[in-house]
From Swiss-Prot:
ATP binds at H15, D167, G168, K169, S235, G236, R237, F238, D246, R252, K253, A269, K273, K277. The gene is METK4. It comes from Vitis vinifera (Grape). NCBIfam families: metK. One of its GO terms (cellular component) is cytoplasm. SUPFAM superfamilies: S-adenosylmethionine synthetase (SSF55973). This is S-adenosylmethionine synthase 4. The keyword Magnesium applies. Binds 2 divalent ions per subunit. The metal ions interact primarily with the substrate. Can utilize magnesium, manganese or cobalt (in vitro). Binds 1 potassium ion per subunit. The potassium ion interacts primarily with the substrate. InterPro entries: ADOMET_SYNTHASE_CS, S-AdoMet_synt_C, S-AdoMet_synt_central, S-AdoMet_synt_N, S-AdoMet_synthetase, S-AdoMet_synthetase_sfam. It is found in: Cytoplasm. It catalyses: L-methionine + ATP + H2O = S-adenosyl-L-methionine + phosphate + diphosphate.
Length: 393
């Protein structure tokens, strides 16, 4: 059997780039909660003892930006300089301006356009991907790396592994078989975990705890064998972490946010952006399209691309490729997709309820992936049943 190796990585919520994503989305949530028509483009950067948020926000919401920043850092676990950042004593800089009136008139006519008339907030192209290799219809390498990262945070916060600190990275290599275009996972080849830790713990204890409390509950036994390689804190020391170890920036983890290197990516990040930004809303609707194609049995694996021009509601192009796994020709699936999904940004916002913030709705997306999550707030994960005969009508 001819097999190949494919690797996906993840970082958990204490990684400086991911901290920035979460702060940007916490700001978005707060804006949308008070004013669903908020226009938000919020970037965050961080380094030792400093967090800065900057960007363009037009909103009726009355917000305490500094409090949002500190609350988000504290919730992640950055409560002292020892762990990489002290949420209550770090410096917080805020440099937020209004959305450019040039953009506002072109995209939403200063809030006068009807939903179906709202133009894309920018040009760009976005991809959605789905594969039948996991129940989530997501790539296994990505699912395992992501779940290991989430589990790392869980055992830190519930006290199972008190030596853990917030920052950490995971990476999983899976051996695959290509079954006529569909991906079939055979085994897990390598598991890599690098996690921040305190001064009290030995490397042997780290390895033992990670195997017992993180890997064992997450990686199904059927994928592990005596040849599986484990790299557990291979650098030997990771005490300094978070923004103290590395600078962080919103939008630096777009592959972790999506499909772990599978499919394709148009380059646009998600966090801190309201739904007129097609980087986010466009990527969400094509995930729903790709997932619906696979869930409906039209293909075993699928990628969907959409593209936009600033100020124009209708997409410039829609593309479907099923990697030769389609039950009907790709051009027929494309026809079904165009009939079943409305790709206009204003309509995506309505159909996926993307103007609803609050309750950490978008904050939740900002760590452990935007796709393949079992949570009613992730409206783009709802499958639309698609029927083959639709194309023949």
């Amino acid at each position: 059997m001819d097999t190949f190796l494919f690797t996906s990585e993840s970082v958990n919520e204490g990684h400086p780039d991911k901290l920035c994503d979460q702060i940007s989305d916490a700001v978005l949530d707060a804006c949308l909660e008070q004013d669903p028509d908020s226009k938000v483009a919020c970037e965050t950067c961080t380094k030792t003892n400093l967090v800065m948020i900057f960007g363009e926000i037009t909103t009726k919401a009355n917000l305490d930006y500094e409090k949002i920043v500190r609350d988000t850092c504290r919730a992640v676990g950055f409560v002292s300089e020892d762990v990489g950042l002290d949420a209550d004593n770090c410096k917080v800089l805020v440099n937020i301006e209004q959305q450019s009136p040039d953009i506002a008139q072109g995209v939403h006519g200063h809030l006068t356009k009807r939903p179906e008339e709202i133009g894309a907030g920018d040009q760009g192209h976005m991809f959605g991907y789905a594969t039948d290799e996991t129940p989530e219809l997501m790539p296994l390498s990505h699912v395992l790396a992501t779940k290991l990262g989430a589990r790392l945070t869980e055992v830190r916060k519930n006290g199972t592994c008190p030596w853990l600190r917030p920052d950490g990275k995971t990476q999983v290599t899976v051996e695959y078989f290509n079954d006529h275009g569909a991906m079939v996972p055979i085994r897990v080849h390598t598991v890599l975990i690098s996690t921040q830790h305190d001064e009290t713990v030995t490397n042997d204890e780290i390895a033992a705890d990670l195997k017992e409390h993180v890997i064992k509950p997450i990686v199904p036994e059927k994928f592990l064998d005596e040849k599986t390689i484990f790299h557990l804190n291979p650098s030997g020391r990771f005490v300094i972490g978070g923004p103290h170890g590395d600078a962080g920036l919103t939008g630096r983890k777009i592959i972790i946010d999506t499909y772990g290197g599978w499919g394709a990516h148009g380059g646009g990040a998600f966090s801190g952006k309201d739904p007129t930004k097609v980087d986010r809303s466009g990527a969400y609707i094509v995930r729903q399209a790709a997932k619906s194609i696979v869930a409906s049995g039209l293909a075993r694996r699928c990628i969907v691309q959409v593209s936009y021009a600033i100020g124009v509601p209708e997409p410039l192009s829609v593309f479907v490729d099923t990697y030769a796994t389609g039950k009907i020709p790709d051009k027929e699936i494309l026809k079904i997709v165009k009939e079943s999904f409305d790709f206009r940004p204003g309509m995506i916002a309505i159909n996926l309820d993307l103007k609803r913030g609050g309750n950490g709705r978008f904050l939740k997306t900002a760590a452990y992936g935007h796709f393949g999550r079992d949570d009613p707030d992730f409206t783009w994960e709802v499958v639309k049943p698609l029927k083959a005969e639709k194309a023949q009508e």
